[in-house]
């Protein structure tokens, strides 16, 4: 028996097609799509309507080594810093842009005129509603923050 006898195929064209890469894998990879430094997550503050593209949403940004937030945050790499070499696991500079309100889930930036943090992040309207449930120190802090933010708007 010839060793090549067991390689004879019933339908050679069908077998070749079965072994081909799927169409989506045949496309050339766009370097722009592969670049992890390109921001792809949209961030829109419901308070001040700031719009920005960010790199990460979650608690543990992969580019900010050792940083773990207590709640999900929209985080972007610092656009004014050069990227670190790929072979070094070096922490990068980053900017925490905002989060979602823990009550109404609206997206808010970290600006004092848009959000307040006390055990969790709140948009100012929800913060005003929750104010009565907080200790006096937190109440004084949010009242001061609201008066300062109202002073800036006028």
From Swiss-Prot:
It comes from the Eukaryota. InterPro entries: CDPF1, CDPF1_dom. Pfam families: C6_DPF. Belongs to the CDPF1 family. This is Cysteine-rich DPF motif domain-containing protein 1. It comes from Drosophila melanogaster.
